Amino acid sequence: MAKPAKKSGPKKAKRNVPNGVAHIQSTFNNTIVSITDTTGEVISWSSAGASGFKGARKGTPFAAQTAAEAAARRALEQGMRQIEVLVRGPGSGRETAIRALQVAGLEITLIRDVTPLPHNGCRRSKRRRV
């Protein structure tokens, strides 16, 4: 029996969003870039893994740059011009991702580090000995 033709869902409507917020989460293993509007609704996102990198290569600065470029490209299609950048995490892709957003054509108005720091909360895990 033939399968019925697959109906594609509604396409995401193109919205004109002139300014927003870029959230960069940079860990040692991956970098995730989410670009939202000022209310926090996600407009575009990308990660090193979604950009085609696997394993240890996801943690590299080049992977972060590629992910940021992909997210910025989609945000520019939605009409975004200015962004604030919120960076979270200790990873190596922090600066490269910010630079990639700037080179892509987005005007950066603010850069803020929002890495959570404990005020002596939970006990740290034991030190790794290699």
Curated annotation (Swiss-Prot):
SUPFAM superfamilies: Translational machinery components. GO terms for molecular function: rRNA binding; structural constituent of ribosome. It comes from the Bacteria. InterPro entries: Ribosomal_uS11 (IPR001971), Ribosomal_uS11_bac-type (IPR019981), Ribosomal_uS11_CS (IPR018102), Ribosomal_uS11_sf (IPR036967). Pfam families: Ribosomal_S11. GO terms for cellular component: ribonucleoprotein complex; ribosome. PROSITE patterns: RIBOSOMAL_S11 (PS00054). GO terms for biological process: translation. Keywords: Ribonucleoprotein, Ribosomal protein, RNA-binding, rRNA-binding. NCBIfam families: PRK05309.1, uS11_bact. HAMAP family: Ribosomal_uS11. Part of the 30S ribosomal subunit. Interacts with proteins S7 and S18. Binds to IF-3. Located on the platform of the 30S subunit, it bridges several disparate RNA helices of the 16S rRNA. Forms part of the Shine-Dalgarno cleft in the 70S ribosome. Belongs to the universal ribosomal protein uS11 family. This is Small ribosomal subunit protein uS11. It comes from Synechococcus sp. (strain CC9311). The gene is rpsK.
